[in-house]
Amino acid sequence: MDRVDAPAEQMTPATDAAADSHQVPQSIDILKIMQSIPHRYPFLLIDKMVEIHAGQSAIGIKNVTVNEPFFQGHFPSHPVMPGVLIVEAMAQTAATLVVMTLGKAFEGKLVYFMTIENAKFRRPVGPGDQLRIHVDKERSRANVWKFKGVARVDDVAVAEATFSAMIMG
């Protein structure tokens, strides 16, 4: 078995109406994420997905290190992860959920950010923090999906936003 695929007992069928009949892994590593979305260093902002509920929700992980390039200028003497990058990590988690849900129906397409609403930043995120990024699909119609995202560090909400994305290609 390829190490990027979950064992059969950890697979769930895709539940979105647009999805073909395929099995969706419940978790994936960075290699599978990189097969799913086009982002790369320094803009790949999720390290793994620890939960995937096809067509419904997902949890992604971002391990924040002192080596992040954005800390060079935000702020050198007191490093803080920019809030907009936390929202981007939510969007990448959601995009990966879309790709995993749609399977072959997604081939040749990309997920593009459309809107960000009600973004709130509750506390700074810095080196050593692990972001646990929860995204829930609120609804979808045709190629537009709307999500609610919450990022947590040590079970404390640090950021939240509602956002939508469009599948194009």
From Swiss-Prot:
<dbReference type="InterPro" id="IPR010084">
    <property type="entry name" value="FabZ"/>
</dbReference>
<comment type="similarity">
    <text>Belongs to the thioester dehydratase family. FabZ subfamily.</text>
</comment>
<dbReference type="InterPro" id="IPR029069">
    <property type="entry name" value="HotDog_dom_sf"/>
</dbReference>
<dbReference type="GO" id="GO:0005737">
    <property type="term" value="C:cytoplasm"/>
</dbReference>
<keyword id="KW-0441">Lipid A biosynthesis</keyword>
<keyword id="KW-0456">Lyase</keyword>
<dbReference type="InterPro" id="IPR013114">
    <property type="entry name" value="FabA_FabZ"/>
</dbReference>
<keyword id="KW-0443">Lipid metabolism</keyword>
<protein>
    <recommendedName>
        <fullName>3-hydroxyacyl-[acyl-carrier-protein] dehydratase FabZ</fullName>
        <ecNumber>4.2.1.59</ecNumber>
    </recommendedName>
</protein>
<dbReference type="GO" id="GO:0006633">
    <property type="term" value="P:fatty acid biosynthetic process"/>
</dbReference>
<dbReference type="Pfam" id="PF07977">
    <property type="entry name" value="FabA"/>
</dbReference>
<comment type="function">
    <text>Involved in unsaturated fatty acids biosynthesis. Catalyzes the dehydration of short chain beta-hydroxyacyl-ACPs and long chain saturated and unsaturated beta-hydroxyacyl-ACPs.</text>
</comment>
<dbReference type="GO" id="GO:0016020">
    <property type="term" value="C:membrane"/>
</dbReference>
<feature type="active site">
    <location>
        <position position="74"/>
    </location>
</feature>
<dbReference type="GO" id="GO:0009245">
    <property type="term" value="P:lipid A biosynthetic process"/>
</dbReference>
<keyword id="KW-0963">Cytoplasm</keyword>
<keyword id="KW-0444">Lipid biosynthesis</keyword>
<dbReference type="GO" id="GO:0019171">
    <property type="term" value="F:(3R)-hydroxyacyl-[acyl-carrier-protein] dehydratase activity"/>
</dbReference>
